[in-house]
From Swiss-Prot:
Major place of residence: secreted
Domain of life: Eukaryota
SMART domains the UniProt entry points to: WAP
GO annotation, cellular component aspect: extracellular region
Keyword terms of this UniProt record: Antibiotic, Antimicrobial, Disulfide bond, Protease inhibitor, Secreted, Serine protease inhibitor, Signal
Subcellular location: Secreted
Signal peptide bounds: 1-23
Ranges for region Disordered: 80-111
Full protein name: WAP four-disulfide core domain protein 12
Protein's GO biological process: defense response to bacterium
Source organism (scientific name): Callithrix jacchus
Protein task: Antibacterial protein. Putative acid-stable proteinase inhibitor.
Disulfide bonds: C34-C62, C41-C66, C49-C61, C55-C70
Length: 111
C-alpha cells in the first residue's frame, strides 16, 4: 500500500467519523410547550427550524402560522388545565397573539 493510498484511506475514515458523529446529535427539547395554532393553511411555509436546538435562547421550534418557526414557548399548564382557556400565557411573538382562525390582535390578553 503506497503512502497516497494510506492518505486517502485515512481521510475517508475521518470523513465517515465526522458524518456519523453529526448524525448522533442529541435533540434536547427546551422547556415549555408550543403555543396553540388555530390557523388553517392552504400551503405550508418553508421551515425556519427543525429542532429546538436551531432556535436561540428560550425559543422552541414550533409549527405555528403555517410553518415551523422559532417562537417563545408557553408555560406548561397545570394538571387538568385547558390550553384553549389559558389567557395568561405569553404571546407567541412580541406584540401578536393568535385569535380564532384568521383574526389577529396587536396586544396580549390581560389577566
Amino acid at each position: 500500500m503506497g503512502s497516497s493510498s494510506f492518505l486517502v484511506l485515512m481521510v475517508s475514515l475521518a470523513l465517515v467519523t465526522l458524518v456519523a458523529a453529526e448524525g448522533v446529535k442529541v435533540n434536547i427539547e427546551k422547556p415549555g410547550v408550543c403555543p396553540a395554532d388555530n390557523i388553517r393553511c392552504i400551503k405550508s411555509d418553508p421551515p425556519q427550524c427543525h429542532t429546538d436546538q436551531d432556535c436561540q435562547g428560550i425559543r422552541k421550534c414550533c409549527y405555528l402560522h403555517c410553518g415551523f418557526k422559532c417562537v417563545i414557548p408557553v408555560k406548561e399548564l397545570e394538571e387538568g388545565g385547558n390550553k384553549d382557556e389559558d389567557v395568561s400565557r405569553p404571546c407567541p411573538e412580541p406584540g401578536w397573539e393568535a385569535k380564532p382562525p384568521g383574526v389577529f390582535s396587536t396586544r396580549c390578553p390581560q389577566k
